[in-house]
Amino acid sequence: MNVYEEKDEQLEEFRYQYRERLDQESEFGLERGKKKRTPLPFFSMAIWSLAATAVSVILPLIFGLVSPQQMQDLYTGWALHQSGQIYTDYYGSNGLLYYVLIYLSQGNILFALVEWLALFGAGVFLFKSADALTGQGEQARQLLLVFYLLVGSLGFGGSYAVVVALPFLFYSFSLVADYLDDPSNDKGFLRIGMSLALAFFLSPIPTILFAATLALSLFGFNIAQHRFAHGLYQFFASALGFSLIFYPIGYYTVLTGTFGDAISHTLYPIDTLSLFSNANLMENVAFYGLLSIGVGILTLIFSGLFQTKSAKQSAVSIGASLGLLVTLALLILSKEPLHGSRLAAILPSLTLLLLTNIREGSSDRISRSRRRVRSSSLFGRYLKGNFYLPLVAIVYLLFLPVLSRYISHPTTYQEREQLASLVKQQTSSEDRVYAWDDRPDLYRASERLAPTSLVTPTLYTASDENKTKLMNDLKENQPKMILVNQKVALWSDVESLLSEKYELVQTDSKEFKLYKSK
């Protein structure tokens, strides 16, 4: 019996060694040739991206849950069909191509189609990147699920420019991921620059931060691999690709005479950052800080900076961690009104950190013996590692606008709509009106244009230059009617203007006052 048992053990050992040798030859062949990839889950991506679009765009537009800043962008898309041009007559800190898309969709629900296509494309390139860096197809699918959940919640009712830029950002990262996976393949850096340029003309500041993240990741990887010369080539190739797109599109602003305004508007979020003279600082720290903890940023940054990973994943995780910290700092130091959708700016870096949390291993398509060893679920680790706080944060981000709109301030919205109808009745289509309000809803509802590019006193007025511009525009253009939200503080100059040039219209409103020019 012992002889037979020994022969069986030897035979089993021979079979195991034979399988391992086949696995090694298969891996060697894949490394020498074109590496086999996991098939893309097209159907899942189409459904998940559609669900994320429905939650973040369609529902907010239908039920009036769009953020004030996003409402201003939608107003811009509608108003551009009436008259004027972007940056000169309409204020915005996003890119030119984004406003072209807003214009084509006329600022209405058609924009949902644009976002769905963007999210589908982003999912394709994100899946390819995860598969290239980790070889874990199933984990890459779970990454997509987490990504679409975060898009639906962080992008609920606003920050659509960031979401539309994601496919171009993730396409550039997919090319970087291919290089990190196989350093002998350093092609495609011209396309990286071109893709980043397109993303820049959609959402400038997040694109700059993402480009810096990629540059830092490549720099660290090339230094560690003693490929500094390759890094120089990659930098110049990317810069050339960026220039090929940037200059032709940017030249449009030169032709129209809006180049200076475009630069000023783009840099506004940076120029108005403040630490010591920021009245919103503590509120920003509490709001964005707690939500950041809720979505797991602290644990992801900690693992990104200190957890042991492969060289290629470490390069990405360190760069993404630093990019995420800078993005959070910009949000906390901002003087713009609070809104949960502004956290969508962290999506690019946050997604990269989630990707690097996938434990790298051999793909289940290569070795049967290694199929027995399965890494834990990315989705499960993400939730359990953060004590299920991401679910709490997602629910909070989705229901806070609903509670504000329909429970906390229903009267405010009802009176705003009623007064918009009254304004429409008492003015002609050529008349201009102004909303001294915390939301620019009046213009679309009354089908009237604003007399200034700064359509409310609470958006883009953190700088003295913009405050002066708003006041001068009101004095020079003198809107036919001015709607005043009594909860929004009136500037002294505006009070003087109202008392001298306007008379109060008698209404039943308790929260608004309506003024008409004398």
Predicted regions and their residues:
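Extracytoplasmic catalytic/substrate-binding loops of multi-pass membrane glycan-assembly enzymes
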Residues: 62-76, 87-101, 257, 411-416
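Transmembrane-helix motifs of polytopic, lipid-linked glycan transferases
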Residues: 112-135, 171, 175
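Transmembrane-helix signature of polytopic, membrane-embedded enzymes
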Residues: 126-151
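Short acidic/glycine- and proline-prone juxtamembrane loop motifs at membrane-interface regions
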Residues: 155-166
